[in-house]
Amino acid sequence: MATAVKQDSILFTFDVRPLKMTDKAFYDFCQSNKDFRFEMNRKGELIIIPPTSIETSNRNSEINYQLRGWTKKDKTGKCFESDGMFILPSGAKRAPDASWMLKERFYALSVEDREERFAPVCPDFVIELRSKSDNLRKLQNKMREYIENGARLGWL
């Protein structure tokens, strides 16, 4: 039985380790619950990501627009918005607000990893946008996690 671990502001974390949720099971769970956004930390705790305010959404949209424009101009990589989930080497499953990776790393992934499941890779560049309800320490730890798992640059 999964148990609630804690509530931090409006962020809920559930300990689902007893369920032994595989990467595929997590993918299927997310696909079956598309009205919600989830992440999973390296400890195997399920995190429910709440919707943001329209102001935060607008800032996130602008960041993704700028990153997309740079990506099209630079032509060395691929960019992703917050619906793109990555399985980090630590086992954490994260969906940064915006991210980018070199084309070579993108195309080194199998078609299945790019199209039919969450990609088992850490992006080269990640952006996490802090909203008023976000805990700064938790976001800093999340950014540290990206760097420890191979991100070369992170913006918070």
Identify the residue ranges that each predicted region occupies.
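Gly/Pro/Ser/Thr-rich low-complexity, intrinsically disordered segments predominantly at protein N-termini
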Residues: 1-156
